[in-house]
Amino acid sequence: VGSEMCIRDRNLYTWDGMFPQEILDGFEKETGIRINYSNFDYDEDMLAKLEETKGGDYDLVIADDYIIELAIQEGLVQKLDTSRISSYDNLNPVFMSQFYDPQNEYTVPYGAGIPLIVYDPGLTDVKITGYEDLWNPALENNVALTANYRVIDGITLKTMGESFNTEDLDVIRAAGEKLLSLAPNIRVINDNNTQDYLISGEVAAAFLYTSQVSTALQVRPDLEVVYPKEGLGFGIMAGFVPAKAPNADAAYAFLDYINQPENAAKCFEYIGYYCTNKAAEEYISEDMKKMIVLPEDAAEGEIVQNISQEAEDLHAEIWNQFKNACD
């Protein structure tokens, strides 16, 4: 009974499957704080819940970059006292100072998704080093793409030296023309299990989400991963303390615990997203490193952000034309 009296609960709100059980158990053993884990399916559901409770009910939330920006704007997030997170300096600066939290006042990154090109050198003689190579006529009817139109339009913009987030409609139209010229090379556009087309040898090259890249490499270690020379596009998940968190102390304790290098390594191996903790990299197993550790020489990254409605509508129109051309 005595030990039960010492157990304090704290409320974590995020997607399902974001932490290995050994981390949750280890934290409770070390601190006496038990985690009540609540899940949401979509970022928008999380924001609605935070709005409803005016930033109360939960001690720590982990969500996607774009929705965190909105939560901060609505006053639902409290500023962090980073002096209370002794492991804070372990974080990788590549994933900090981003659009949703430019001064790093509110959030701690917890994993990044970076879509990449993966190809089968046994099926093509094209030495792929960037997005531009996907246009090579030698890859006719031999490429699979994921179905996120802002990202696919975005990599086309990158081949033109432009930003994913340009609002220049003439530039976006020019990218649309160029994207149409990629259609002959596209075998499939699909968001679900896109890696299967590459694993089976149905296509020679694919543009895949992080989790799909990991799956493909686990099955086919002979596949080549490309960090495109034109620059990476990525999304970041991050933790924050809601404005009226009932147990902010517990949130700080957990953020500190999961960013200790060995603990962070276990977390990133488990979730399969890119490691946002520099000090954890040496503890990540060699076979996982090529899947979740960003190479030192990787090109600069850029996050897809909210843009004007006019630009957004033009992207959607371009995407529909492209999909029709691929059918």
Where are these regions (language model features)?
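A structural signal for short loop-to-beta-strand junctions that line the ligand-binding cleft
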Residues: 56-63, 78-117, 142-144
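Mature extracytoplasmic/periplasmic domains
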Residues: 237, 242-300
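Conserved C-terminal helix/tail region of periplasmic/extracytoplasmic solute-binding proteins
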Residues: 296-327
